Amino acid sequence: MHRLIFVCTLVCANFCSCRDTSATPQSASIKALRNANLRRDESNHLTDLYRRDETIQVRGNGYVQSPRFPNSYPRNLLLTWRLHSQENTRIQLVFDNQFGLEEAENDICRYDFVEVEDISETSTIIRGRWCGHKEVPPRIKSRTNQIKITFKSDDYFVAKPGFKIYYSLLEDFQPAAASETNWESVTSSISGVSYNSPSVTDPTLIADALDKKIAEFDTVEDLLKYFNPESWQEDLENMYLDTPRYRGRSYHDRKSKVDLDRLNDDAKRYSCTPRNYSVNIREELKLANVVFFPRCLLVQRCGGNCGCGTVNWRSCTCNSGKTVKKYHEVLQFEPGHIKRRGRAKTMALVDIQLDHHERCDCICSSRPPR
């Protein structure tokens, strides 16, 4: 009898912890529980009820949401919605302003998250993975007529309100067709209601858009975390192992001892000198189908004016008198081949050449030809 009471107490405690989010657990407690690798009882019906994969034919407006939204969602979920629309149409996703999942760990959505993927015949592009409570995910427009939404929660802590995503056709809106509800109000169609939202362009991850996204990262570690949050450390290590004879060829000029008198004279007479200049690699190399990290590099380029304050100085231009090419080692991507797991073959360290101006001359139209 005592054994039965003990088992009932454990089951009750485990089930109630799924709903209680009033207290914020300490990070140490979280790690301890995760390391213990505790599992829910397989007899718990929620485990089977919420492990689903559903295909939705998008003919109008509707939504998908986490179970029990806007309350705490259950644990141990793996839900997938595959949205399909007619050919020559696209699908728009808009997140409800009430959004909250378990917080990220080290800025990585590792445990509870919602993920959106663009699906085509040739590739799958992850549009984003979100968790936490800080901000609502952006509006998303699919590249094709297919898009996939995945929601995952682990065996431990849950949060509320979860999420709700409204979907709609971008073109040729038709009256919403009724769809079957497969589980506990997780999926629903909005019948007789026109769901309109502002037309905001959501750039897909083509080269130009990815180039802008890369601008948000300060380190290559942050960049790899974005592409592969689960395997970025392995990608970072393999980046150098893939090159059998890795040898960086980047170099910089040696600087001679500064001559203050000469600098002062140059400022008065010829401020046309090589100086640091930031160039966008894609623009500099005229490559439109690849992106680089870092996006920009410092080079020496001629700048300033000529003979500032002297006669005819406005008619002079500062041009390169000697140009050399220098090697720079960067990380190169081909966006169409980026994969979620593992490092794509088209992501590699490469050497590029950029022009550096070593000497600058003033060319003045008033000066007679030499």
Curated annotation (Swiss-Prot):
GO cellular component terms, A-Z: extracellular space; membrane
Signal sequence range: 1-18
Entry function: Growth factor that plays an essential role in the regulation of embryonic development, cell proliferation, cell migration, survival and chemotaxis. Potent mitogen for cells of mesenchymal origin. Plays an important role in wound healing. Induces macrophage recruitment, increased interstitial pressure, and blood vessel maturation during angiogenesis. Can initiate events that lead to a mesangial proliferative glomerulonephritis, including influx of monocytes and macrophages and production of extracellular matrix.
Gene Ontology terms for molecular function: growth factor activity; platelet-derived growth factor receptor binding
Keywords, sorted A to Z: Cleavage on pair of basic residues, Developmental protein, Disulfide bond, Glycoprotein, Growth factor, Mitogen, Secreted, Signal
Superkingdom in the source lineage: Eukaryota
Quaternary state and interactors: Homodimer; disulfide-linked. Interacts with PDGFRB homodimers, and with heterodimers formed by PDGFRA and PDGFRB.
Name of this protein: Platelet-derived growth factor D
InterPro entries xref list: CUB_dom, Cystine-knot_cytokine, PDGF/VEGF_dom, Sperma_CUB_dom_sf
Family classification: Belongs to the PDGF/VEGF growth factor family.
Glycan attachment residues as annotated in the record: N276
UniProt keyword annotation of Signal present: yes
